[in-house]
Amino acid sequence: LEADFAGEVFLRTSETALPPSAAVAVATRAAEGRAVVLADSDIFGDDSISDLDNSKLLLNILGFLSLGSKEPSRDIATVRAVLTQSPAWLSMQTAIEELRPLQSKDGSIEDQSNHGEAAMWVEKVIEGINELAPKFPHQVDYLSQAIKDLQSWINSGFAIPDFYESLELFRPDRNRNNDVQHLAVFSMYTQNGNPNRNLEVLVTNTFWPDWLAQKEQKYSNPAFVPIEFIGFTSGYDNNSAVFFPETVAVREVSTYKWGGIFCDREAARFRKVVAGAQELLYLPLPYDAQELLDDQFLAQETFVLWDLIHDRTHSRGDLPFDPFMIKQRMPYWMYALEELRCDLATFRETLVLEAEGDRLAKYIRYAILFDRLFRFPITGNRVRNYDGLGGQIVFAHLHKKGALHWRDNRLTFEWEKVIDSVVELSNQVDALYHEGINRSRLAQWIASYEFVTGLVPPHPASNWAKGTDQLPSAGALKDVVNLVLDDEFPLNVFYETLNRKLGDLVLATKGITA
């Protein structure tokens, strides 16, 4: 190395080697990234690079050294503090929370005696938009229309609100640049959160580093917008981690153009719940898995790449139904299998990514596995909990294959069996979908039920478990759906224990951010 080398030296030869104390692993800044150089002959030897897992280890070392600092380049905490201490933001928050109890489930305000007060609070929201607008110059058209929609709501006598025009102009997908903030004002419900279409105010930060933009060229998903919370009203002080246009109150369905995923909330609650499960179950973890639990920024990176691949998978493969299931009423295990299919496909894709040297591939596998096993089944109530059922299916399959053991109140994995077992489950779900193309809807529901019950026992009082000849197959499909119990597939004894001991911890993740 040159005497004035300004990079980092990670490994050197020993003092007695020839040459002594020579650098064999170094890294330095290169434009916006890092360049890593390894003297591989001194680490493995040219004749042994293909032995054992040496080539994989070499790629892992390169990936690890190229990371540099794992901290984000920007201070989100400061950005949040500036917004949340702003008088305009505080005034808007107050106005929103004062409006909340006046609104009906559909967003309207029926009691005319409250209209005067409501108009005052909506005007406060409009004032706040005008004061904050200079901070969002890229949203000038949207914010102008949002004010018009709010004024139209007042003029309508607070009928069901209609934000169609402003929603058409709210396009975060057109500005997917790292650390770009967006202000959103809509009457909306929040998925897995507030079921009512209350007026909400939200400020988001786009999480779009260069490496993710490059990955999106391979995994094209133009509607995908990973975001972080900067500020939000209480409609998001819950478990909701998504921001979708279909949640907004509009007079007609708007074309699907974007979908926001709060990667900071996803990562933070994952880390908290899995760490709790690790302690409770005396779970020994590989170093990489522990690293994921210990590092919020790494977890966010992991979740955005998982989400990018998962989201696009909904429209790929053998699809015996509308993959997004919009306004379809089906037994809830159909939704469970669809979400699970996309996660399993993502899990498999990490094997391709890993072969290409992607540093996040192994972390995505741990994230999918642990989120599915530990958080999903005990989050939310037991009323048609389709995400929870997906986790129950994964547990049952891994347990059946001997890749997972729960003995002496301790959970262990046979890691050498895990990947093959998950891929096998993915193949089984794919086969179910492939064969479903030749079935009627009801026949596919029945085949899917039989697949699930092969792993997760149904409720003893299940109507469906009595046999297909007991189903009212001659009537409307809704009659068969109505026979599905709210908790058709109850938690097993493992999850009953996990829920009893970790339930409070899961509840404590309500409203969590990074």
What are these regions (language model features)?
Residues 131-290:
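Contiguous, non-catalytic segments that form substrate-binding/exosite surfaces or channel walls
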Residues 72-203, 435-514:
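Extended, compositionally biased alpha-helical segments that mediate assembly or anchoring
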Residues 335-351:
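An active-site-proximal "capping" alpha-helix that borders the catalytic cofactor pocket
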Residues 289-306:
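Short pre-active-site segment immediately N-terminal to the catalytic Zn-binding motif
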Residues 318-340:
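Post-HEXXH active-site segment of zinc metalloproteases
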Residues 300, 351-453, 458-459, 465-466:
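Long, well-structured alpha-helical subdomains associated
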Residues 303-319, 347:
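Active-site recognition of the HExxH zinc-binding catalytic motif
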Residues 1-73:
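Short, surface-exposed patches at the edges or C-terminal ends of soluble domains, predominantly
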